[in-house]
Curated annotation (Swiss-Prot):
Chain positions covered by the region annotation Disordered: 34-79, 492-513
Protein name: Zinc finger protein 668
Matches recorded under Gene3D superfamilies: Classic Zinc Finger
Outcome of swapping residue 286 to S: In a breast cancer sample; somatic mutation
Crosslink site: Glycyl lysine isopeptide (Lys-Gly) (interchain with G-Cter in SUMO2): 57, 59, 65, 80, 154, 512
The keyword Acetylation appears for this protein: yes
GO MF: DNA-binding transcription repressor activity, RNA polymerase II-specific; RNA polymerase II cis-regulatory region sequence-specific DNA binding; zinc ion binding
Encoding gene per record: ZNF668
Coiled-coil residues: none
Family annotation (Pfam families): zf-C2H2
Record's function text: May be involved in transcriptional regulation. May play a role in DNA repair process.
Length: 619
């Protein structure tokens, strides 16, 4: 009882009462009660506290911050022994409880749950600060924005985002930080301490919580939901940044151009556009980048890594954003809407490109022929007409194509033929796309180096007795001419190019098996026209419906072309008259109505011409 009375009358040696807290006389640490202060004071040893107090001087702010961030504070005038070393990192501590508390940063253990919301914390002091937010106790308010905090330390870290202060500098790379916890995490990257690795892609992290956040990119889990628009996120920080869009908050403003940003990282990347700084260098190709996300995306292109997997179709992607945008193809979500024609798009850049159609801007001009385009991709495709480039090759037959969509359509013919057991049709290899509509008697191909005169009808796959019958649809592919369909009121279906075109009669042609197979029910047809007419009965083969009239199409290009009939958009303008058309093929047909100057020779079009053979000719 006498000991207790003595403790009540005066504090134990090694600490003193300062207001409502107890302050250590050796290191200036404070504690909420006397027992904790006494236990802490015992770690300094039985030194004369009065002499230590005289030696303790206030440290400069920058030195104190660096010590706070590194966890290497010095007690008194000399460093005290730290016998408890962490086996996972270079840190050491004076007591076993301090080491156990530090170990939670490696294991991710959070033994202190919030009774209100269930959120868990590593330290009890963090839980107390969090509980103040539930009680509405946020006494520390930012003077620059409406945010408030329950702890003064959090407010100071937040205010550095407004002032640009970054007092924690890395001695290895010079990078600076505003938050000491982020600085500590960064230092582990130099030490090579990344004990938490992803089982799917092998990526390693220094913190368990970072691994948990990364794993959501593989599983697609997005537990953080925006109450305003319903959009979900995989990280709480992403939700916080997103909510600033609804609140019209852009706390990070560029002093050079006045542009505002919702995220500090976006603001820092924007600053480099003014300075021209590109600090991220690719060691493989030497290319430099101004922001780390572009640099990481570029590195995956070198490595060929596509860790983000679509569960519905099995397609892989390099970026989680690419996977999220791809999923809209399955869900039908098209959140970006044109205000002028109500057309919707999957991605924002598709809407921006579409807006050029309404504005009439065509900034990309061909240097060869002067034709202008609204998109750079359209100019790139058009330039292949002049260069002859056909970069998309079929792995099955070796054919090459100007655009990837033509390759995909061609590959469907292989799949349908394989499903029906029909061998691929033979094709005639020629060097030029010869004019259609000429007829001859011989069926032999011209010898190499011979003069290019009128090709015989048999060479083009027409029956010898057809005379001037026109093949109205031909497809020019690679170095072959493939007969697609021959239509004439009084002429039967034309045989293939190598099916004995010079033989008398049509007995073998009558016995020719059907070549056009339905992809859904495997029924066969003698012409492509009959097949297309039949496939309309299978809605599964037409997965792209028009939202205005309900008509369905087998591919997205057909739907896009059809949707123009509901709007006033006519993107293909005739250079000779004011008329405009829905499609490029309609424009080409119309251009033939304009007279050609007399004496102009009709050159043989190279086989690499994008438009192929003309659809009409002299009978």
């Amino acid at each position: 009882m006498e000991v207790e009375a003595a403790e009540a009358r005066s504090p134990a040696p090694g600490y003193k009462r300062s207001g409502r807290r107890y302050k250590c006389l050796s290191c200036t640490k404070t504690f909420p009660n006397a027992p904790r202060a006494a236990r802490h004071a015992a770690t300094h040893g039985p030194a004369d506290c009065s002499e230590e107090v005289a030696e303790v001087k206030p440290k400069p702010e920058t030195e104190a911050k660096a010590e706070e961030a590194s966890g290497e504070k010095v007690s008194g005038s000399a460093a005290k022994p730290r016998p408890y070393a962490c086996p996972l990192c270079p840190k050491a501590y004076k007591t076993a409880p301090e080491l156990r508390s530090h170990g939670r940063s490696h294991t991710g253990e959070k033994p202190f749950p919030c009774p209100e919301c269930g959120r868990r914390f590593m330290q009890p002091v963090c839980l107390r600060v969090h509980l103040a937010s539930h009680a509405g106790e946020l006494p520390f308010r930012c003077a620059h924005c409406p945010k408030a905090y329950g702890a003064l330390s959090k407010l100071k870290i937040h205010q550095r985002g407004h002032t640009g202060e970054r007092p924690y500098a890395c001695a290895d790379c010079g990078k600076s930080f505003a938050d000491p916890s982020v600085f500590r995490k960064h230092r582990r990257t130099h030490a090579g301490l990344r004990p938490y690795s992803c089982e799917r892609c092998g990526k390693a992290y220094a913190e368990l919580k970072d691994l948990r956040n990364h794993e959501r990119s593989h599983t697609g889990e997005r537990p953080f939901l925006c109450s305003e628009c319903g959009k979900s996120f995989s990280r709480s920080s992403s939700l916080t940044c997103h909510q600033r869009i609804h609140a019209a908050q852009k706390p990070y403003r560029c002093p050079a151009c006045g542009k505002g940003f919702t995220q500090l990282s976006s603001y820092q990347s924007h600053e480099r556009t003014h300075s021209g700084e590109k600090p991220f260098l690719c060691p493989r190709c030497g290319r430099m980048f101004s922001d780390p996300s572009s640099f990481r995306r570029h590195q995956r292109a070198h490595e060929g890594v596509k860790p983000y997997h679509c569960e519905k179709c099995g397609k892989d992607f390099r970026q989680p954003a690419d996977l999220a945008m791809h999923r809209r193809v399955h869900t039908g979500d098209r959140p970006f809407k044109c205000l002028q024609c109500d057309k919707t798009f999957v991605a924002s850049w598709d809407l921006k490109r579409h807006a050029l159609v309404h504005s009439g801007q065509r900034p990309f001009r061909c240097e060869e022929c002067g034709r202008a385009f609204a998109e750079r991709a359209s100019l790139t495709k058009h330039s292949r007409v002049h260069s002859g480039e056909r970069p998309f090759h079929c792995n099955a037959c070796g054919k090459s194509f100007v655009v990837s969509s033509s390759l995909r359509k061609h590959e469907r013919t292989h799949r349908s033929s394989e499903a029906a057991g029909v061998p691929p049709a033979q094709e005639l290899v020629v060097g030029l796309a010869l004019p259609v509509g000429v007829a001859g008697e011989s069926s032999a191909a011209p010898a190499a180096g011979a003069g290019l005169g009128d090709p015989p009808a048999g060479l083009l796959g027409l029956p010898p007795e057809s005379g001037g019958v026109m093949a109205t649809q031909w497809q020019v592919v690679g170095m072959t001419v493939e007969h697609v369909e021959c239509q004439d009121a009084g002429v039967r279906e034309a045989p293939g190019p190598l099916e004995g075109a010079g033989e008398a009669g049509g007995e073998e042609a009558d016995e020719k098996p059907p070549q056009f197979v339905c992809r859904e029910c495997k029924e066969t047809f003698s012409t492509m026209t009959l097949l297309r007419r039949h496939e309309r009965s299978h809605p599964e083969l037409r997965p792209f419906p028009c939202t205005q009239c309900g008509k369905s199409f087998s591919d997205r290009a057909g739907l896009r072309k059809h949707s123009r009939t509901h709007s006033s958009v006519r993107p293909y303008t005739c250079p000779h008259c004011p008329k405009a058309f829905l499609s490029a093929s309609d424009l080409r047909k119309h251009e033939r109505t304009h007279p050609v100057p007399m004496g102009t020779p009709t050159p043989l079009e190279p086989l690499v011409a994008l438009l192929g053979m003309p659809e009409e000719g002299p009978a």
